[in-house]
C-alpha cells in the first residue's frame, strides 16, 4: 500500500513512478466516502473533469454534485458531462444552465427526440431506446478516476431517507486511468451521442441562475446541512487529510462495451461478457458473485453448474424479493433457484430491513433503513476481481453498454470476499432445500436462527405475481 497526499498531479506521479506497470486501487464501499471522494477530486481538478453516468438525480446529493461541477468550471476546469437520456426527465433546465457555462459541455446518449411524452417515443422507437448507456465514470485531469456501480443520487450516497442502495466503487490512479480517458472519448464522439442543443430547445431567456436557485433551496435544508457535516467527517476525508489514503497496487485493465452496441452493431465476441471470459481465468476454487439483478438464463445456469461439478464453490449474493426494486427481474432469477441449489450453488438474498436512521452506518455491502443491494462485483479464487456497472442479466450482456475493471489482486479479492462473508450472517437470508426438496430461507436474527418457508416479508399476492412472471418470454429484456 502507498499513500496519496498533496496536489493531485504531483502526488500521483510520484506514486505511479514507483509502480510503473500497476494501478493504485482504493475501494469505496461506504456511501459517504463515495460522495466525499468525488467532491474532493472535483475540487482538486486543474484541467479536465469527464463525467459519464446513467442516472443523475435532481435531489440533494445530485444538486450538491452539480454545484461542485460548476465550481470547477468557474475556476477554469474544462467539464464534459455525458448522460444517458433515459433518466433526465425534469433536468432539461438544469442541463441547459450547465451547458451555457463556457467551460461546460453537456451531451446526451441515445436521446429522446420527444421531451414531453417519452412513453410515446418508446412506442415508436423501441428498438433504439431500449438500449441504454449504463456506464459510470468520474475522471479528473486524466490522473484519477472513480468507476463502479453508483449513479448520482441520494440513495447511492447514504443521503436518502427510507431506501439505501448498498454499492461499490473503486478510486483508481495509474495506467488504467488513461484507458478510461480513451474510452470516454470514444463514447463522447460516437453516433449515439447528441449535443444538448440538438434535442433540448433553448430557453427563452438565460437561465444561468437555475442551479444557484436550486442550491439555495438545498442550502437551507437542515438535512442537507447535516449531510455536509457528515461528509466532512467521512473516512475518505480523514484519511486524505492525514496523508493516509492506502492504495492497493495491481495490474488493472478496463473492459468496456463498444458504444456501437447501442446500435446493435457489435459482434457477440466483442461484447464485454465475451471479453471477460477471455481475460479472467476460469475459477478453480471459489467464485463469489454480487449482483443486484441476477438473471442467469439457461446458458448461465449451465455454466455455473459446470463449475460446481468441477469442485468450485460458487456463491451468489443478490436482492431478496422485498429488497428488489424491479419485481420482474426477481422472477427471472427466482425460477432458477431450485436448479442452482440442487447442484450445490450457494444462494444468499439481502434482507429488506426497517432500521432507524439512528443506527450506526454499516461499512460493508449493506446499509441502514431498508437496504437494497446495488453493488456489481465478482471475485475469482483469491486472485482476480471485477468491479463495474455490469449486472448478471441479459440486459447488461446484450442491450446496455457497460464497463468495469478487472483487477489482479489477491489483497482486493480477499477484501471483497470479506465484505461478502461479513454481509451474509446478519444481513442476508441463506436459501436452501430441506431433505424433502422444500425451499427455505434461513435468517440469523441476533442469536436466533429463524427458518422461513415462504419468501420473507412478502404476502401471498406478491408471490403469486412473481410466479406468474416465470412464464413470460421476457428474459432478454431483463
Predicted ranges, named:
Residues 1-134, 140-478:
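Charged, low-complexity intrinsically disordered terminal segments
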Amino acid at each position: 500500500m502507498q499513500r496519496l497526499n498533496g496536489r493531485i498531479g504531483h502526488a500521483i506521479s510520484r506514486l505511479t513512478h514507483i509502480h510503473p506497470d500497476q494501478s493504485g486501487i482504493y475501494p469505496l464501499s461506504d456511501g459517504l466516502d463515495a460522495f466525499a471522494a468525488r467532491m474532493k477530486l472535483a475540487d482538486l481538478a486543474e484541467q479536465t473533469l469527464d463525467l459519464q453516468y446513467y442516472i443523475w438525480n435532481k435531489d440533494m446529493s445530485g444538486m450538491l454534485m452539480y454545484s461542485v461541477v460548476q465550481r470547477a468550471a468557474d475556476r477554469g476546469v474544462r467539464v464534459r458531462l455525458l448522460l444517458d437520456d433515459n433518466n433526465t426527465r425534469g433536468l432539461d433546465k438544469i442541463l441547459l444552465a450547465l451547458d451555457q457555462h463556457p467551460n461546460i459541455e453537456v451531451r446526451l446518449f441515445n436521446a429522446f427526440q420527444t421531451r414531453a411524452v417519452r412513453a410515446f417515443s418508446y412506442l415508436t422507437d423501441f428498438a433504439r431506446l431500449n438500449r441504454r448507456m449504463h456506464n459510470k465514470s468520474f475522471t479528473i485531469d486524466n490522473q484519477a478516476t472513480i468507476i463502479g456501480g453508483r449513479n448520482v443520487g441520494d440513495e447511492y450516497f447514504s443521503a436518502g431517507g427510507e431506501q439505501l442502495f448498498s454499492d461499490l466503487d473503486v478510486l483508481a490512479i495509474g495506467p488504467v486511468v488513461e484507458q478510461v480517458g480513451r474510452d470516454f472519448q470514444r463514447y463522447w464522439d460516437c453516433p449515439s451521442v447528441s449535443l444538448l442543443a440538438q434535442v433540448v430547445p433553448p430557453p427563452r431567456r438565460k437561465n444561468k441562475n437555475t442551479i444557484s436557485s436550486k442550491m439555495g433551496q438545498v442550502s437551507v435544508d437542515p438535512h442537507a446541512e447535516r449531510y455536509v457535516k457528515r461528509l466532512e467527517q467521512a473516512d475518505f476525508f480523514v484519511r486524505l487529510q492525514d496523508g493516509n489514503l492506502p492504495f492497493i497496487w495491481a495490474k488493472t485493465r478496463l473492459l468496456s462495451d463498444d458504444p456501437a452496441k447501442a446500435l446493435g452493431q457489435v459482434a457477440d465476441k466483442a461484447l464485454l461478457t465475451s471479453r471477460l471470459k477471455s481475460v479472467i481465468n476460469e475459477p478453480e476454487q471459489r467464485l463469489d458473485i454480487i449482483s443486484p439483478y441476477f438473471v442467469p438464463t439457461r446458458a448461465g445456469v449451465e455454466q455455473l453448474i459446470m463449475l460446481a461439478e468441477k469442485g468450485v464453490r460458487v456463491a451468489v449474493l443478490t436482492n431478496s424479493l422485498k429488497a428488489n426494486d424491479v419485481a420482474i427481474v426477481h422472477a427471472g432469477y427466482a425460477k432458477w433457484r431450485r436448479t442452482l441449489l440442487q447442484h450445490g450453488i450457494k444462494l444468499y438474498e439481502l434482507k429488506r430491513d426497517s432500521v432507524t436512521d439512528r443506527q450506526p452506518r454499516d461499512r460493508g455491502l449493506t446499509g441502514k433503513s431498508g437496504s437494497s443491494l446495488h453493488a456489481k462485483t465478482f471475485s475469482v479464487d483469491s486472485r482476480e476481481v471485477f468491479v463495474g456497472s455490469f449486472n448478471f442479466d441479459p440486459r447488461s450482456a446484450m442491450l446496455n453498454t457497460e464497463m468495469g475493471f478487472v483487477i489482479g489482486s489477491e489483497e482486493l479479492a480477499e477484501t471483497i470476499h470479506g465484505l461478502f462473508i461479513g454481509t451474509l450472517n446478519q444481513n442476508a437470508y441463506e436459501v436452501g432445500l430441506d431433505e424433502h426438496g422444500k425451499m427455505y430461507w434461513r435468517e440469523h436474527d441476533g442469536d436466533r436462527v429463524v427458518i422461513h418457508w415462504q419468501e420473507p416479508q412478502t404476502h401471498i399476492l406478491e408471490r403469486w405475481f412473481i410466479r406468474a412472471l416465470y412464464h413470460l418470454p421476457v428474459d432478454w429484456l431483463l
